[in-house]
Amino acid sequence: MLNISHYKIIAIGKIRKKWIQEGIEMYLKRLPGLEVKEIKDSTQLKEEHTIKEIISKNEFLVTLNENGQSFTSKQLATKLLNSHNQNITFVIGGASGLTSSLNNLASWQLSLSPLTFPHEIARLLLIEQLYRAKTITQGGPYHKE
């Protein structure tokens, strides 16, 4: 079973759309222990510096970008389960994305889709997929084939 308290999301920018915020809040209620840190929009280099200050050396870093590895929901659940409850930090860039040096620092890069999404929607999608992964590993009814 996934231990959500081992996961953290660092996201650039505020959620401005109410419907996205409501969706995020709904899933966060279902994922007690998931930490979400929001970083103010800035230049990519300033954002990178702030992110590097937040992450610790013992964390497994996953950056989100369109060039990352794609998974089905079940594959992602399995990958997370196989991480053996390691501390994992997911990083979602802002409008300009993440620096290449930050992406290179990541243990792996995740693509939610070959499509490009606004960072607000990417955050909602990631949180929903973490909830889905949790229910898949628990054998719950949320994920349907």
UniProtKB/Swiss-Prot annotation:
Reaction(s) the record says it catalyses: pseudouridine(1915) in 23S rRNA + S-adenosyl-L-methionine = N(3)-methylpseudouridine(1915) in 23S rRNA + S-adenosyl-L-homocysteine + H(+)
GO cellular component: cytoplasm
Record-listed S-adenosyl-L-methionine binding positions: L64, G93, L112, S113, P114, L115, T116, F117
Enzyme Commission identifier(s): 2.1.1.177
Disulfide bonds, paired cysteine numbers: none
Assembly and oligomerization: Homodimer.
Role played: Specifically methylates the pseudouridine at position 1915 (m3Psi1915) in 23S rRNA.
UniProt-listed HAMAP family: 23SrRNA_methyltr_H
Protein's recorded name: Ribosomal RNA large subunit methyltransferase H
Lineage summary: Bacteria, Bacillati, Cyanobacteriota, Cyanophyceae, Synechococcales
Gene behind the chain: rlmH
